[in-house]
Amino acid sequence: MSAHGDLGYLLAILGQWERSAQESKEALRLDPTVAIYYGNLVFAFRGLNRLDEAKTTCQQAQTHNLENAWLISDCYGLAFVAREASALQELVNSARGKVGAEDVLLSNASDTEAFYGRSTKAREISRRAVESALRDNRREAAALWQLNSALREAEFGNVEEARKQVAAALGMSQSRDVHLLQALILARSGEMARSQSLLDDLAARFPLNTAINRYWVPTARASLALQRDEAQAIEVLRITAPYELAYPDPTLQTGIFLYPAFVRGEAYLREGKGGEAAAEFQKYATYRTAAVNCPLGALAQLQLGRSYLLTSEVDKARTAYQEFLTLWKDADPDIPILHQAKAEFAKLQPLAN
């Protein structure tokens, strides 16, 4: 890639979308035949909510018969925002049989199913993503797709399923990124000792790695702190602020977006600070075109309802709960967090009368 192309990509994953768009446009001016430049520009335009320009960029890439996993994935995210179900499936189909692309798009599709609470379908598509990567002997990629699935299970309250999937991933790869996500999943599942040990080891071995020490480790440590000291969780997350809109490695498509904000919102909820919590969870709506099918975006809607209850804004709380339950109208009925949401919403009804 050119210097402009490299910078456009780096700025995109750092969440600096305006600058990324400028660099990516210059890269394309100099060489309009490189697929990833189009992907960077689609990503940047989508983050900026300039959806027409993003769509035009996807179309331009198609006219040049250009494609790679990054570009197809970015166009997939655009189709999700536009609620174009047929386009989503076409993009998944377009990656079929292509090394390094098929598994990426399948994992993307699994996040879409999870966004709507369809866990069984999400698991099945994740299984296909894992198998696709393994067929290409890309064992770390396979493990990461398995961990993406495990992370969703942990967030949905399916802790045993999450642990089972983590064990499966470790059988595929023992890479740094695999252990990093393992630590986060364990933290989100309440396994304090094992997670803490992994986090300490990663921080010691990679002291200069920004993604590890300013995004992943603080997010996991804050998740652990939630169980004993909400104020400490908020303090630990302070260092993540400049990188909140980033997609740091290991990149799991959109499944990790705004993780520090989500955990910070949880900490404020536990402190009883509904207004502050709502501000964090509202970020998923504010950055909807960047969050796309991140399953946390759906859960943030539920957390908004909980936040509004703390501020005695009952009508807003009821609306937030209703919007979450509408999103999950076809969800698998046995998901723990769905049971909780329905029970909370049922109790809310008399308060609103």
Positions of PLM-derived features:
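Short coil turns that delineate tetratricopeptide repeat
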Residues: 32, 66, 99-100, 134, ...
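Alpha-helical repeat scaffolds
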Residues: 21-26, 51-63, 84-98, 121-132, ...
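Structural signature of alpha-solenoid helical repeat scaffolds
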Residues: 29, 63, 97, 137-138, ...
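TPR alpha-solenoid repeat register
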Residues: 3, 37, 70-71, 105, ...
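Terminal, low-structured helical/coil segments at or just beyond the last alpha-helical repeat
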Residues: 318-353
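"A position-specific structural signal for the A-helix of alpha-solenoid helical repeats
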Residues: 6, 40, 74, 108, ...
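Structural motif corresponding to the intra-repeat A-B loop/turn of tetratricopeptide repeats
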Residues: 14, 48, 82, 116, ...
